Amino acid sequence: ESGNSCYIYHGVSGICKASCAEDEKAMAGMGVCEGHLCCYKTPW
């Protein structure tokens, strides 16, 4: 199940999910995610 893509900042985007994996960061409160978390990984 994949959700909407969510944009964090330049060069970093994630996927809206109900819960994030252990190696992912989570950003809450993004409108595009409709109450879910935006799960993303930073490239560094």
Swiss-Prot record:
Residues 7-10 are annotated as: Inhibitory motif. Its main location: secreted. One of its GO terms (molecular function) is alpha-amylase inhibitor activity. The keyword Disulfide bond applies. Signal peptide: none annotated. The keyword Ribonucleoprotein does not apply. One of its GO terms (cellular component) is extracellular region. It comes from the Eukaryota. Is structurally homologous to beta-defensins. Specific pancreatic alpha-amylase (AMY2A) inhibitor. The recombinant peptide inhibits human pancreatic (Ki=0.01 nM) and porcine pancreatic alpha-amylases (Ki=0.1 nM). Belongs to the sea anemone alpha-amylase inhibitor family. This is Alpha-amylase inhibitor helianthamide. It comes from Stichodactyla helianthus. The lineage of its organism: Eukaryota, Metazoa, Cnidaria, Anthozoa, Hexacorallia.
